[in-house]
UniProtKB/Swiss-Prot annotation:
One of its GO terms (biological process) is mRNA transport. The keyword Iron does not apply. This is Zinc finger CCCH domain-containing protein 3. Residues 128-141, 372-398, 847-856, 864-885 have a biased composition (Low complexity). Residues 157-166 have a biased composition (Basic and acidic residues). Interacts with SMAD1, SMAD3, SMAD4, CPSF2 and CPSF3. A zinc finger (C3H1-type) spans 667-695, 699-722, 723-749, 750-777, 778-800. PANTHER family: CCCH ZINGC FINGER, ZINC FINGER CCCH DOMAIN-CONTAINING PROTEIN 3. GO terms for cellular component: mRNA cleavage and polyadenylation specificity factor complex; nucleus.
Amino acid sequence: MEEKEILRRQIRLLQGLIDDYKTLHGNAPAPGTPAASGWQPPTYHSGRAFSARYPRPSRRGYSSHHGPSWRKKYSLVNRPPGPSDPPADHAVRPLHGARGGQPPVPQQHVLERQVQLSQGQNVVIKVKPPSKSGSASASGAQRGSLEEFEETPWSDQRPREGEGEPPRGQLQPSRPTRARGTCSVEDPLLVCQKEPGKPRMVKSVGSVGDSPREPRRTVSESVIAVKASFPSSALPPRTGVALGRKLGSHSVASCAPQLLGDRRVDAGHTDQPVPSGSVGGPARPASGPRQAREASLVVTCRTNKFRKNNYKWVAASSKSPRVARRALSPRVAAENVCKASAGMANKVEKPQLIADPEPKPRKPATSSKPGSAPSKYKWKASSPSASSSSSFRWQSEASSKDHASQLSPVLSRSPSGDRPAVGHSGLKPLSGETPLSAYKVKSRTKIIRRRSSTSLPGDKKSGTSPAATAKSHLSLRRRQALRGKSSPVLKKTPNKGLVQVTTHRLCRLPPSRAHLPTKEASSLHAVRTAPTSKVIKTRYRIVKKTPASPLSAPPFPLSLPSWRARRLSLSRSLVLNRLRPVASGGGKAQPGSPWWRSKGYRCIGGVLYKVSANKLSKTSGQPSDAGSRPLLRTGRLDPAGSCSRSLASRAVQRSLAIIRQARQRREKRKEYCMYYNRFGRCNRGERCPYIHDPEKVAVCTRFVRGTCKKTDGTCPFSHHVSKEKMPVCSYFLKGICSNSNCPYSHVYVSRKAEVCSDFLKGYCPLGAKCKKKHTLLCPDFARRGACPRGAQCQLLHRTQKRHSRRAATSPAPGPSDATARSRVSASHGPRKPSASQRPTRQTPSSAALTAAAVAAPPHCPGGSASPSSSKASSSSSSSSSPPASLDHEAPSLQEAALAAACSNRLCKLPSFISLQSSPSPGAQPRVRAPRAPLTKDSGKPLHIKPRL
């Protein structure tokens, strides 16, 4: 409630002040009063205050032939250039005077004005009438400085009926001051009130003497658009300004020229400067009819309360009731927002916003005619950043080009259909101001300066084509005739030329096309979607255009093929196999195709290749159709040529892979042929990829036994005995091998060790160092009579058909091959039974030892390898005498044990015992005595055997 009461009071004060000012200074020159006699800035509590003086010299001193020379001289910068310093100092003097308690020097035709924003979101605009009591010298000096400062003629810029005038004045951030007096009754005051649920209304209040000293903030709005002419009977609330308040920092540069600009009316009073508190507020004209029209003007204000980077189009048009439009995007809208914001209140040097005393008399837009209803477009931005000052300097272009060509590219898509007259009145749209021509805002944190030499083709479209606008949620596009998409935007990237942005691709244009006329740019998209081009939509969205369409396009016939043909060739060469029947219409049957293309041949680099499913074979012939060869060389526009290249590439890769594999197969692997090593021959012969080394062939077992009859070198096995090729001696594993020249390897291996796979192949390179069993017999089959691997087992499976015959009739351990093989195989079986029989072998008799060795099935299951037979036969002679001695020795040591053992074994092995027994009983004691130590010595090797 408190805020509402304050708002009402401010509205009353503003309205009364305006009415009093009009009654006092209607059509006469403003009466001169001391500048600081009655008005000081209001209380500065928490906001910012901007106070400025606006020198208003009479028009009669201006020349009428200077043109737009002010553009080269003045700009909106952080610190004004040299020529603008005197007015800037004048603008700050009143505040310094108010702060120091000294009245500022009165100047003739100087309006002092203050625009503030209270806490209740109300805009308060104070206007101090010009003083007459100034000294002649001061006014003369001021007049001279102003005439020197303002060189632009105003005779051709006087507003006609229904037109405004370019704003003039300066706005500079002032230091925080506290008012020590009250405003005089003559001070006009404009209050923009925002009531809940209603648009903001600007009213004038007369007396401000009792206005409360609330903290006020200076309005630094983004846009102000003012309509100069209205019907005398209508008070349209839709026309006026939008004094949008931004909650954070306010972009002052965008609104300063309009917010604090003045209007002069030449209806019979050309000498009298008529002040205006705000261009958007009710103007105080000097003419009677316009006074009647504009005295009761109600201006609709709209506040943008978004805290994001949201931008709106704010329009003041008598034809459209809409006052705001949403912008296309924050990035594009930011291009039209001046980044020079108000500085902190405690800083001395702040960004100064100069609405030039001689504002920029731009040419009106091409679509606006004299007498047409003027419309203004402004970007209204609300930025959440509360930056105190801006370090960027807005500098106008020094060139005399048309500044409309330096607008942002999105202005070409700006809504201009219902408001065609963009800049006909004096209040130019903000898009035409100099700050936007020099810089382009890419994001919130980065400002990129555009090159002054760039002339964007879409920039001239804001006034040329008043096409209907379509306002959508995501974009603001112009609807052009016969155009389905938005017009392409040409971006300027440094050192890379223009890049054409369309929906799906970025195309870099050559530097020669950096400066395109408007017609060429408008026809740029028409060429891209020419009716003569084919558009083939597939799953991958591939667009194929015939080369005749881009090559015959009239706007740029020379530079087009450089980038267009490249893109066409790229799009064709991507998915040629899928597109070929569609794009070329059965390209093999084309009338211009050579004969060899339809027969599965392809010409690659002038050489014919026959293309099959997986092979590309080169032919000796040359293509007879010579006319097609240049077409194939420039195959970027020839889908068949590109297809042949693609097929050739795949076929070549496949053929190379085949050759590589064949070469790898031919190479000799670093492995020995298992067939050659085991059997001495290989059926593949020289085609075998493995190594055939005669030194690694297995030893002939018959040669070891001395029974090989092929001693002339025809034996496929090796007659060179080496222990690397021989299996492990089974007697050595038992600990009973007494042959000093045993050809078998004497190596201790674990009982649990697996069979060496290399030895199975015929040769183990590790030899005696191998920790695996070097055997050719299957231990599982030898132990249990069955192998779990079955036919896949690589070891020998010897049957036990000779076991019963050997157990019944075998006279000695070694004469029969089956016995020898069984003993070799017994070395690979479990050795516990043999260990348990050692005491019986030492103490009772040799008959018990041999009986246990022969009768135990784990020791002698099945047969053994053929090499072991020779070993058994060779060791039989040496081992025949120790069993006999042991047999004679046993009864003398323990006859009872011998009798019990013999009684137990006689039934099992009667023939064996009878063979070992001596015929003469008297010879037994004689033989036993000398053989007793031998028995102890012969038993010692049994303890050497490891128990792993």
